[in-house]
Amino acid sequence: MNNNFDRSKHIYHNEAFVELVKDAIRFFHGTPVHTLPPPKQFKGAGVYAIYYIGNNPLYKQYADWNRLSYNAPIYVGKAVPKGWRQARNSDNALNQSTELFHRLKEHSRSIAAVSDLDPSDFMCRFVIFEGAGSDMIGTIEAALIKLHKPLWNSCVDGFGNHDPGKGRYEQAKSDWDVLHSGRVWADRLNGIPNSYES
């Protein structure tokens, strides 16, 4: 056992990994843009970005940025394969499910539930990771968030939240749910939300 600590012996760096991440991000930015949700259900898990193109004055800058090309996502997220967190996922095509499509559909329902946003004002793009590539999902999501700093990831937290479930409604509404009220489960939350004045 060595009691001398040298931080440099714990730092991992691999230029090939850095290039792999850059390549995946380049591929992501070249994927087609679709309505939210996409027009057809598909199998797979992966990373996605949501773009705003509507007239809500809160997000006018995003609509302007995305007018000619989709370069400014308002939100970036991921959908992982079933069993991913417990390392029980299968790469077998017969066992693939539709996590990515359903996550995008869930976001569309969240937007439709509020009165001041319209799902038709949102577009999305995504990349599907299969096999060993699914290990990249979290890394690429984090890299895209770091690169774009989407508003609903960085400043207005809570868009991607799920219903916390029975017995867990003592928490406060997220910033997103305070700005855009209407999600039924969020209206059940009893905690005191953050003050916008502080």
PLM regions: where:
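Boundary/linker segments flanking structured domains
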Residues: 1-74, 78-198
